[in-house]
Swiss-Prot record:
One of its GO terms (cellular component) is microtubule. GO terms for molecular function: microtubule binding. This is TORTIFOLIA1-like protein 2. Coiled coil: none annotated. It comes from Arabidopsis thaliana (Mouse-ear cress). InterPro entries: ARM-like, ARM-type_fold, TORTIFOLIA1/SINE1-2.
Length: 820
């Protein structure tokens, strides 16, 4: 029986173990599948959701298995997988914060290893995860701060690594842990601060910006428990402001800003030095540094405390040498240099015998009066000194005032040979020191001293004698005490000179700093001006080279275009002659001695005007302008139409002709054209004298009229090239007809090289002789301008032609006004 029960028990245990292994295997398989989904962008979000769901419903006994899956990720995996494995540790701490305690050390070690990752996304995930662990595990802290030590110790050891990524990541993780911990142990973080300050002062340390942020977190967490530790930490920040690396300077300024933003009272003694350090790098060459420095200055100026620096060691040593009976903290605080409410130093003069109100007191100013103004050779001065103390020279120098009436009193007594001063003994002790030459028990009643002794010792400033101080009147016993005063004046003179020397050194230091700042600003301005000059020279050279290159390219374009158009013109003329010969036409175009050019648009295309030609009956080859205006008045109608739109070339030629004529009349017109051309050529060449009463302009216009009547566009283009622009030799009606045909060619982008000179002449003559010279009608001018502007907006194969049309349109728009 027992044997059977044992066999059954063993079988049950084996079955349970098998089930457990099966569950673990399924969990690992599920996690691995989800991690594989992270490697693909399309399935990344799905994998993240599955992993978070798995962590949320994870059983307590499966935590170890899950951690083994995410901690053993290979470095060859994609950055998304590595980042998500680190982030899942924080997710696990959020859902199961009570279960991850035993595995905390293993998790932190894995995070420290991941700090070497070259991808910044993975390192940022490490910093974020450490913050989550610190915030969630802080509630399980014991008296020995075991959780905090487990989080901090591996990271602090990693700061000493020689890898830059590890140093920076470990410092930032520590800063996040301290910021996320509700109560960081002060003893631990204080020791950390002392170590990190040494690291920050080490010139060979790499990750200084991260350590600066760590020190900032420690100080804000209360790690600077003593004044010396706080001073050393703040000094390290101030030294970092002078670092060559701008990220270090920016981190230091941000740290100073965040510390000053707390507004704690213990920052008061550090206010002056921090403001001075920030002011020195206020004009940093990097803008982010300048912005953070300006913001830090704003916060530090709001910190309670004095902006002036504490007394220097030199000043303190001078004072301590003459005040052995008192402690330095009581005698040489900043309040010693101010006139307190309870302290009153009263002077009485025998000359005025009047009381001066307290509001009228004015201390002597050392640089206001000229010593040469006091011409008295011997003064009788009676001084009453307090029984317990002697008036400090520093108190006299710092007692600024408003005593205009005292100046007037002294002006009335400048001619007196002797001046008497009395010091009234005071019962209350002033906050000033007692010199070694006079004991506290000495009761000085009166002193008679010659003015030469005061000048020799330096105790009495000539500026002091220029003002009279008055108070209560008292009769005192007079005793000569000149010898003791002479012994004491040398000591007082030394103290005065020492104080003035300290002030002078401070002012000189500030002046030197301001001069260096001005010099730096001047250097920056000079460098900027030189850079601007170099940039202008460089840009000018580039523009010149570009202009030369553009001119060469334009010349090349013109040459190629001329060759192409010349070849096209020869081809078009040959085709036109062949077509006309087949149709029985006797009109044949002739090539001029000049280069005849036409557009490539008329290739393999018969002229639309070759089949519809019109002639004009001419009784003579040369007609006067009067007969011309009478005979052509009806036929030369507005070629642009009443609506302001251009007609087709056929309509223009139809309006020019008076009617369709027979083929014989066309031949006759062709013969007339030939005869006129011969006459014009003979007249222009000088072989034949012009006919009496007929000018050369009439010959030119008659030839154009004959060509217009014939309807031969190739002959017209040849004539345009041969004569060139001669609009000044034609009547307004002929000009309108020619311009109408030229504008039709322009809109069709044909014969551009032939018509552009004529359009240029239109602009030039209108500029020279007025807008109404060629086209008196404003309506026709508007129509012509509209057509040219429309053509300027078209696409030209030749950029030079488009520029020429645009320039003509701009000139005419300035002359004739913008076309509506």
């Amino acid at each position: 029986m027992k044997t059977n029960m044992q066999v059954k028990g063993r079988g049950g245990n084996m079955k349970a173990n098998t089930n457990t292994q099966q569950v673990i295997f399924e969990l690992k398989k599920k996690v691995v599948i989800a991690l594989n989904k992270l490697a693909d962008r399309d399935t990344y979000q799905r994998g993240v959701d599955e992993l978070e769901k798995t962590v949320e419903h994870l059983a307590p006994d499966k935590v170890s298995c899950f951690l083994s899956c995410i901690l053993d990720t290979d470095s060859e995996q994609k950055s998304a997988v590595r980042k998500e494995c680190i982030r899942l540790m924080g997710t696990l701490a959020r859902f199961h914060e009570g279960l991850v305690g035993p595995y905390l050390g293993k998790m932190v070690s894995s995070i420290v290893k991941r700090l070497k990752d070259p991808d910044s996304v993975v390192r940022d995930a490490c910093i974020e995860t450490m913050g989550v662990l610190a915030s969630k595990m802080s509630c399980y802290e014991d008296q020995n701060f075991g959780v905090f030590v487990s989080l901090v110790k591996p990271l602090f050891e990693a700061i000493g690594d020689q890898n830059k990524y590890v140093q920076s990541g470990a410092a930032l993780c520590l800063a996040r842990v301290i910021d996320s911990s509700p109560e960081a142990p002060v003893a631990i973080i204080q020791r950390m601060l002392m170590r990190t300050v040494k690291l920050l002062n080490n010139s060979h340390f790499i990750a200084k910006p991260a350590v600066i942020e760590l020190n900032r977190s420690i100080i804000l967490a209360g790690g600077a428990t003593s004044k010396s530790v706080l001073s050393s930490a703040m000094s390290s920040f101030q030294d970092a402001l002078k670092n060559k690396d701008w990220t270090t300077r920016k981190a230091a300024s941000v740290a100073l800003m965040e510390i000053a933003a707390t507004g704690e009272k213990f920052l008061g003694p550090l206010k002056a030095s921090c403001i001075c350090s920030l002011e020195s790098c206020r004009f940093d060459k990097v803008k982010p540094v300048r912005d953070s420095v300006i913001l830090a200055l704003k916060y530090w100026k709001g910190v309670p405390g004095s902006d002036s620096p504490e007394p220097s060691e030199t000043e303190s040593s001078v004072k301590e040498s003459y005040n052995g009976a008192r402690e330095s903290s009581e005698l040489f605080s900043t309040s010693d240099f101010k006139v307190k409410d309870g302290m009153s130093i009263k002077y009485v003069t025998d000359v005025t015998r009047k009381k001066v109100p307290v509001s009228a007191r004015q201390p002597p100013t050392r640089y206001n009066d000229d010593p040469r103004k006091s011409n008295q050779d011997d003064w009788h001065i009676e001084i009453a000194v307090p029984e317990s103390s002697f008036v400090s020279k520093v108190d006299l120098y710092n007692e600024e005032s408003e005593g205009s009436c005292i100046t007037k009193t002294f002006a009335e007594t400048t001619n007196t040979p002797e001046v008497t001063y009395e010091y009234i003994p005071m019962k209350d002790k002033a906050d000033s020191y007692v010199t070694g030459g006079v004991n506290e028990n000495d009761d000085i009643k009166s002193i008679t001293v010659s003015s030469s002794s005061f000048r020799a010792s330096g105790m009495v400033n000539p500026a002091i004698t220029s003002k009279n101080y008055a108070a209560e009147e008292t009769d005192l016993e007079e005793q000569p005490f000149s010898t003791q005063v002479k012994d004491r004046t040398s000591l007082d003179s030394f103290v005065t000179v020492s104080s003035s020397q300290i002030n002078h050194d401070c002012c000189a230091k500030i002046a030197n700093e301001m001069a260096s700042v001005r010099k730096q600003l001047s250097d920056i301005e000079n460098k900027q001006s030189r850079l601007i000059d170099q940039l202008q020279v460089f840009s000018t050279g580039i523009m010149n080279n570009f202009s030369v290159l553009q001119s060469k390219v334009s010349s090349l374009e013109y040459a190629v275009e001329g060759i192409a158009q010349n070849a096209a013109l020869h081809s078009d003329i040959s085709n036109s002659n062949f077509v006309k010969h087949n149709q029985g036409s006797t009109i044949s175009p002739r090539l001029s001695s000049c280069t005849s050019r036409t557009s490539t648009d008329i290739r393999n295309r018969q002229s639309t005007l070759s089949t519809s030609k019109y002639s004009r009956e001419n009784k003579t080859h040369v007609r006067s302008r009067l007969n011309e205006s009478q005979g052509m008045e009806k036929t030369r109608s507005n070629p642009l139409g009443k609506t302001g739109q251009l007609h087709t070339r056929e309509d223009i030629w139809n309006n020019i002709g008076q009617g369709r004529q027979t083929l014989i009349q066309t031949r006759t017109s062709s013969d007339s054209i030939q005869s006129i051309r011969q006459q014009y050529a003979e007249v222009m060449s000088g072989t034949r004298k012009p006919v009496t009463g007929v000018s050369c302009e009439d010959v030119v216009e008659s030839e154009y009229l004959q060509v217009l009547s014939s309807g031969d566009e190739l002959a017209l283009v040849e004539l345009l090239d041969r004569t060139g622009p001669v609009l000044e030799s034609m009547s307004s009606q002929t000009i309108n007809e020619i311009l109408s045909i030229l504008l039709s060619y322009l809109l069709e982008r044909r014969f551009m090289n032939s018509i552009l000179p004529w359009l240029h002449q239109v602009a030039d003559l209108s500029t020279t002789n007025g807008a109404n010279y060629l086209i008196p009608s404003a309506r026709k001018r508007a129509q012509v301008l509209s057509a040219i502007q429309e053509a300027s907006g078209m696409d030209f194969s030749n950029l030079a032609e488009r520029r020429a049309v645009t320039q003509i349109a701009m000139k005419l728009r300035k002359l004739w006004g913008k076309c509506s």
